[in-house]
Amino acid sequence: MNENIEKKLSILPQQPGCYLMKDKNGTVIYVGKSKKLRNRVRSYFRGANDRKTQRLVQEIRDFEYMVTSSEIEALILEMNLIKKYDPRYNVMLKDDKSYPYLKITSERHPRLIVTRRLKKDKGKYFGPYPNVIAARETKKLLDRMYPLRKCNNPSGRPCLYYHMGQCKACAENPPSVKEYQEIVQEISSFLQGGFKDIRKNLAGEMQKASEALNFERAKEIRDTIQHIDATMEQQKMTLTDQMDRDIFGYSYDKGWMCVQVFFIRQGKLIERDTSVFPFFDSPEETIVSFIGRFYLHENHLKPKQVLVPVGIDNELLAKVLEIQVHIPLRGRKKELVQLAVKNAEISLNEKFQLIEKDEERTIQAIEDLGEQLNIETPHRIEAFDNSNIQGTDPVSAMIVFEDGKPNKKEYRKYKIRDVKGPDDYDTMREVVRRRYSRVLKENLPLPDLIIVDGGKGQMSAALEVLEDELGLDIPLAGLAKDDRHKTSELLYGMPPIVVPLERQSQAFYLVQRIQDEVHRFAITFHRQLRGKSLFQSELDKIPGVGEKRRKLLLSHFKSINQIKKASIEDMRKLGIPSNIAELVLNHLNSPNDDET
């Protein structure tokens, strides 16, 4: 603990607020909150911490704090700071899992769509659904029952759905605003649990149609009722009042927490969400922060009611979330909370050993790698690889590993702009220059280690840009491959020397994974780019074939060869004029055409 931290600890106030832990670069690596800042922050430096917390404390070189007037303000501030800084040790909600919802848009001609994005717009959202199939099946059922618009851009001409009786937006006299509101209200009622009343009304209509000898209409209604039964009865009933609820249960051990969330919609348990993560504050404060972020900063629609176990500050959560947050003390609701807690315990016990082993293995790998290179532990590693075929469509790719694990959000692809021909060294210079010029311009975090796929030439090219042009002093290593294109050795220094990594060591496995991953990412990007240029180049040369017609042809015929075999009549069926179809076929079947 340095002198600066000692001084700050001595003057910490005993008030609610948030604290920001920083590393040697001034980067915020952890954000926390507390009712009493002095007690909480001091506990990191003066308590007996587990290995995980010790690792965090070892990286802390400074901290800041912000005092708030209440615990509610501290919770809201904590969530906003975590969203702003995305600290490495605040990992509780980084899986980006999102669920499908049904949405009625707020357009003049509203649509019913499946979406995973919750926007603050005037649309109405219903869900979440356990998977996209369940959401689409429900949408399909509602499409049969209610004639909302199906097409994206109604042109005024009747569409296929209009002729099927499933869309009125293209009719000569489309529904009025009032009629649309009535349809939207019926769909909303259906999705909020009113499908039983709708089923009952349909049964009455079927009876009347049958009595009037209108058997065709009676059969249509019967089919609709069967679709309702098939779609809505797939899920197990759990509560009789059909209120939308989320139920939280949690368990913790050895500095790790598991949270189980049960999604109850229309009285039915439709899905559960499991999160396992390390935590550094008290369990009670951690679960409150988790639930707050779950709704305010993640892709989750707030239900009418949230149920939580005993010991959670439900009043604080209710004020922050502005919904009902209850602690049930008896009955079926209490049983469901206990079930969520039990599932959290089981999940934690099942996953704990695997998570702990994986954590130890990856941390050990980067620590060993740092020791072998005689540098500080490389928490952030950026790796580069180039790809081209005889200089055509040259590309480069960069991947990021943080604490021994890939962070795919940080991956980047580069089309090479200035290099002509197969020059791997100039390609490396260009991509390193572009990457770290931007890092400096936008004040982005610098890596602890850069790895390039290649030997002395690639390393020299990268160092030339980093040190001579940009004035950066970042450790750089190279990865050489054997004749079977497998990771052979790690090179470091200039001139490069072989780093003696044991082939069975975690450090060697790590650099091998990095080399394989950056190669995969680069070659995939190159194939996509090359495939796109080969696939579309010939169509681009034909007068009268713009982007829409090109997409239409490729979507229908799948390949250039299949387009060659088509007839003018085949293309006319797609709405392509005869003269354009003739131009396409003449061009593609000319002797100078290259096969693709």
Swiss-Prot record:
* Primary location group: cytoplasm
> What does the record list as GO biological process?
nucleotide-excision repair; SOS response
Gene Ontology CC terms: cytoplasm; excinuclease repair complex
The protein's job, in short, is:
The UvrABC repair system catalyzes the recognition and processing of DNA lesions. UvrC both incises the 5' and 3' sides of the lesion. The N-terminal half is responsible for the 3' incision and the C-terminal half is responsible for the 5' incision.
Ranges for the UVR domain?
196-231
Instruction: Quote the SUPFAM superfamilies the UniProt record gives.
Output: C-terminal UvrC-binding domain of UvrB (SSF46600), GIY-YIG endonuclease (SSF82771), RuvA domain 2-like (SSF47781)
Q: What is this protein called?
A: UvrABC system protein C
Residue span, GIY-YIG domain? 14-91
Q: Which InterPro entries match?
A: GIY-YIG_endonuc (IPR000305), GIY-YIG_endonuc_sf (IPR035901), GIY-YIG_UvrC_Cho (IPR047296), RuvA_2-like (IPR010994), UVR_dom (IPR001943), UVR_dom_sf (IPR036876), UvrABC_protein_C (IPR050066), UvrC (IPR004791)
GO function terms (MF aspect): DNA binding; excinuclease ABC activity
For this UniProt record, the keywords arranged alphabetically read as follows:
Cytoplasm, DNA damage, DNA excision, DNA repair, Excision nuclease, SOS response
To which protein family does this belong?
Belongs to the UvrC family.
Q: Where in the cell is it found?
A: Cytoplasm
Superkingdom field: Bacteria
Tell me, how does this one assemble?
Interacts with UvrB in an incision complex.
